[in-house]
Curated annotation (Swiss-Prot):
Belongs to the queuine tRNA-ribosyltransferase family. QTRT2 subfamily. SUPFAM superfamilies: tRNA-guanine transglycosylase. GO terms for biological process: tRNA-guanine transglycosylation. Zn(2+) binds at residues 323, 325, 328, 354. This is Queuine tRNA-ribosyltransferase accessory subunit 2. Its main location: cytoplasm. The lineage of its organism: Eukaryota, Metazoa, Ecdysozoa, Arthropoda, Hexapoda. GO terms for molecular function: metal ion binding; tRNA-guanosine(34) queuine transglycosylase activity.
Amino acid sequence: MKFIIKSISKNSGRLGQLRIKDSKELQTPLLLQTTKGGSIPYLSADVFGMVTQEQQVLQLTLCTMDQMAESLAQWNRSLGAYVGYPEYNTLLLLRDPCEATPTGGNDRDVVPLFTRRGKESLTAERYLQLVSSFAPDVYQGLCDADTNPESTKKRVQKSVDRTERFMEHCYKQHRELDRLKDSTLLAPIVGGYNTYARTQSIKHAREQPKGSYGGYIFEGFHTNGLPATRLSPSQLLPIVEHCVQQIEEELPRLMPGPLTPVLMLELIRLGIDIFDTSYAYCAAVNYKALTFSYTIDKEEHSAFLDVTDEAIREEFKPMLEGCKCLACQKHTRAYVHHLYKTNELLGPILLMIHNLHHYMGFFDVIRQSIAMDQLSLLLDYVRRQNMPNDVNYCIEPNTKVVGKAAMGKGFITAAN
């Protein structure tokens, strides 16, 4: 994996080019496509091809794909080809950023992997065995990331010490396993909200021989899912800034999870390069269409459109005026509300199409703003949306959500 910084600004973050293996050059800040079990949620490859024709990177998760390891070990093509996207690169994470990860289950030599089949305790040896079966283009090192803003100093220190032990094995095996010889390892930086612990984690990574890893992944700030949308910038940003000052500029930095648009912009300004679409997914499964504006104007805008709201049942206009996505071009708010009322599968499909299109457009504007050194202007606009007060981008669980047990049935009530 090759990463080149094109421009850098104190107030606007940095623009870069990322090339994974022999793929096309990817522009950073980069948005990874979050997947569930190897598939982009609700969308077939053909439908996703109508959302975008641009080169993408799939963010796959071991906790939703571990059952595929045996067959993948016999697969002689790329991981992207296995999941139906042969032209896309792949990045493998341990945990699903869309779902809150249960706490506990950590031990001296194991990390819990929560799957649909229950909990599996992963040793570093077992983890590398699974990763080598997948042979992704990029993967994260094994880490204890079970920390959040409420974690005690003792829990934080244990997460750092365990991660160091796991990574000693990962660095060694990464160099020796044949199926990982073309893969890039991301070094995890853990330590909760403790600057001393974060410094210790960074120091351990930087002590490794040059070329041992190709980038950083920041873990341990949250436990994924909707709680990540409620992170406090005043707590998070000083820790991230502290970390960024201690790591090499020439390596890319990844921050997974459903972070709010405002927090993403703040992190980009600090120098984080890679994010994912889990926020768009979390909004969709809670019946919310993204409607915040990133094209500066003088009108007031809201963060979401709640398609369960009875007030839109006779609104025969797009979910977002002026949106060019397939859903908004062909369907109305009233129709999407009708799909929710009748539990039709097309409902979440249309929401996912719209939210992904909107979020990818948001990142296009982010890159343009950085190029013009105007990210601060975009940040102020997205934060207020011409409203008297800051807009709330936190995603609260809807009383009616898409039930996991019957995802193929479309919208269903929690009671079902």
